[in-house]
Structures are given as structure tokens and as C-alpha cells.
Amino acid sequence: MSFVSKSPPIVNSASPTGQVNPMEVEKANKLLEINRLILWKCLELQHIKTAQNSTLEQRALSTELFNSYIQRLKANLAFVVSIASPRQMQVLTPPLSCPESLPQLEPLYKELRQYFQIAQTSTLSYPPSNGDSSSYANGTDLHGNTGTMQQEEKANPSLTRSDSVSSGSYITMQGANSLKAQQDLLNSFTGAPSNNSHNIPDPNLSQTFSATSMGPPNNNYSKFRTDNYLARSSNRSGTPNIQNEQSRFFDSQQAQVQARALMQRYQQGMEFNK
């Protein structure tokens, strides 16, 4: 299943001078925050995959989750890069519904949907989407679940913008380092060389995104454990598809080692330079 919506391409609304619209900065920062937590779950899933005490079913389920997270990360990063690019790349709307297996991310996705809703009502740069956005409006998420999104809309009938714009509107290239860090981590998972990743924003771009900490999730997000989800999922009906056991996303133990090394370097305040 693709996590990129099938809506018409969107042209982002940065000015000719390269300055990014404050609302676009809000979207980018929120997506980077979401990605940080998803990347940590990918590390957990790799541990489950390589652990000697993991059952075949647990490995199959972890592979399934991992692949879906990777697709979501790619879509999110493509959108963030398109906002920062002075060339105004055309990309599709990123996923706007929270993954079923990561319910603790719903508050972040709720804010993200608000940013897109505000943009749709205030500018023509974002036409209605036939993909994830419309799924949210129809009360159906990426996993086919219904009702949750509709309940949220009823509880929040008016989506209004905050009076103040976050500090992400006035930032330095430290934000680009955060974006590059996530791209490097994604490449370490997929085995792709660094020069095949999305282009990092032009160093001359005067405004980019606020840095996102790559440290472990805080207590608000650490209550959920991926292995608990796998244990619950193992009770579902049907036999898991284990044909993805040799998936390229689990190429080798080396990928896990590289990912953890990158994470450690970031926590120590080192820059991610090629």
C-alpha cells in the first residue's frame, strides 16, 4: 500500500527570494518531529528482527510494520525537501492519518491535519486531496478504520491557527542538519547511498526549519512498545505473510549498527557531513 496520496501535484508557495511560507515551516517541523519517533520505532523493529528469541511470526510482523514505516518516512521527507527547495519541486500530500500501530502519534497528526486544513482554506496552493486527506475527511484512515477521524472533527468543529508562529520561521541551517540526519538514517535502513537521497536544501536558503532532536522519545511517547503491538497482532486471524523475510529493508546487521551509530553521533552534537 502506498502512503503517498493520489491527489494532483502540489506547488508549494515559497517566495521567489527563497523564503518559506510560515505555514509551510509549521508543516515541515511537524513532519520532522513525527519522523523522529517513527525512526526510533524502526530501530526497535530491527532489534526484533535480529533478536535470537524472536519467533518467525514476530519477525514477519515486524517486517510488515517496518516496510510501511519506511514508505511513510520517504513520503514525509520528500514533502519537507520540496518545501525547502528553491526550485519548487512538485510533490504529493504526505500521509495525514496516524498509523494504527503508533496511536501515541495521533496528537501530532491532529496538529498536522490542522495545518493542511488552514492552508486549504486560506490559499489555492493546496487543492482538496483524493488520498490521505480525503480519507481523513471521510473518517477512514490508511488501515481502513472508520469513525475515529469523524469523532475528532465533531469534537473540534473549527480548526483555527495559533496566534503566534513557532520559532521555526526564524532559524538557521541547524534545521537542515536535522533533515540530513533523518535522510542518513533512512539510507542506513534501506541500504541506499547518501547521494541517492533527496537533495538537501540549498545552503544559501535564508530560512529553513528548526532542528529536531534525534534523541529517544520522551515519556509521552515511550509508553508504547512495538513488541507489545506485535504480541497483540499475533492473535489476529489468518497467517502472516512471511515472504518479506528477505526484504531489502532488513539487508544486514550492518544497517542496524550504522543507524545506531548515526543516532549516537547526533546525540553528541556532531554534524552529519558526507
From Swiss-Prot:
UniProt biased composition (Polar residues): 123-150, 157-167
Location (main, coarse): cytoplasm
Region (Disordered): 123-167
GO cellular component: cell division site; chromatin; cytosol; nucleus; SWI/SNF complex
Lineage top rank: taxon: Eukaryota
Keywords, sorted A to Z: Chromatin regulator, Cytoplasm, Nucleus, Transcription, Transcription regulation
Record flagged with keyword Transferase: no
Compartments reported by the entry: Cytoplasm; Nucleus
UniProt record, GO biological process: chromatin remodeling; regulation of transcription by RNA polymerase II; transcription initiation-coupled chromatin remodeling
Oligomeric form and interacting partners: Component of the SWI/SNF global transcription activator complex composed of at least arp9, arp42, snf5, snf22, snf30, sbf59, sol1, ssr1, ssr2, ssr3, ssr4 and tfg3.
Function text: Component of the SWI/SNF complex, an ATP-dependent chromatin remodeling complex, required for the positive and negative regulation of gene expression of a large number of genes. It changes chromatin structure by altering DNA-histone contacts within a nucleosome, leading eventually to a change in nucleosome position, thus facilitating or repressing binding of gene-specific transcription factors.
Protein name: SWI/SNF chromatin-remodeling complex subunit snf30
Organism field: Schizosaccharomyces pombe (strain 972 / ATCC 24843)
